[in-house]
C-alpha cells in the first residue's frame, strides 16, 4: 500500500438473494472474519469498474450496480478511508474461491448467509436493521462507518 495517499477509497458491494447476504471470509480482526466483498479502487479505474473487478476477483460473480447505498469514512492513523457501499445485482457467474495469488489478506470462503444469522458472523444488530429497513437514508454521506453498523 502506498503511504503517500491522503485517502484510500474502499468500495464494497451488498448482494442479497433469497434473503441471504453474500459474504467473504478473511482475517479482519480478532472479533470478525467475515465481511462484505470489495476492496480498494486502483489507479485509472472508475468506481463502477473497480467494484465489478473486485466482485469478480473475490467471488467469481458478475454484477452490476443497482444503486449507491452509503458513503462513509474511517479516520485511521495513517490515512482516511472513504468507504462507498453499493447495492448490487448478479448478472452472471458462479461462486468460486479466488486464487489469492496477489492478496495480502487471502479469502478462505465465499457464501450467502441468511440475514437473520449475520450476528453469528460478526455483524451488528444495527447493520441487520439497516438491511431489514430497506437501506433508509441510502445515497447519503453517513459519517463514520459505525453509523451503519459496519465498524469492526
Residue ranges with predicted function:
Residues 20-57:
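Conserved Nudix-box catalytic region and its N-terminal flanking loop in Nudix hydrolases
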Residues 16-21, 29-30, 42, 61, ...:
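Short, charged/polar surface micro-motifs in flexible loops or helix N-caps
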Residues 13, 68, 86-88:
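A structural signal for short, well-ordered beta-strand segments
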Residues 62-70:
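A short coil-to-beta-strand element that immediately follows conserved catalytic motifs
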Residues 74-97, 111-114, 130-134:
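Active-site-adjacent beta-strand/loop module that shapes the phosphate/pyrophosphate-binding cleft
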Residues 1-22, 37-40:
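Conserved N-terminal beta-strand and adjoining loop/helix that marks the start
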Residues 5-7, 32, 80-82:
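Residue-level preference for beta-strand/loop junctions
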Amino acid at each position: 500500500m502506498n503511504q503517500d495517499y491522503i485517502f484510500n477509497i474502499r468500495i464494497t458491494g451488498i448482494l442479497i438473494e433469497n434473503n441471504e447476504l453474500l459474504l467473504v471470509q478473511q482475517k479482519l480482526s480478532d472479533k470478525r472474519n467475515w465481511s462484505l466483498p470489495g476492496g480498494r479502487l486502483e489507479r485509472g479505474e472508475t468506481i463502477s469498474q473497480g467494484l465489478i473487478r473486485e466482485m469478480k476477483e473475490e467471488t467469481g460473480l458478475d454484477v452490476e450496480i443497482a444503486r449507491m447505498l452509503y458513503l462513509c469514512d474511517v479516520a485511521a492513523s495513517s490515512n482516511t478511508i472513504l468507504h462507498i457501499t453499493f447495492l448490487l445485482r448478479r448478472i452472471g457467474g458462479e461462486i468460486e474461491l479466488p486464487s489469492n495469488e496477489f492478496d495480502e489478506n487471502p479469502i478462505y470462503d465465499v457464501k450467502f448467509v441468511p440475514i437473520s444469522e449475520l450476528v453469528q458472523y460478526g455483524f451488528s444488530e444495527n447493520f441487520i436493521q439497516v438491511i431489514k429497513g430497506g437501506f433508509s437514508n441510502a445515497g447519503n454521506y453517513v459519517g463514520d462507518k459505525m453509523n451503519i453498523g459496519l465498524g469492526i
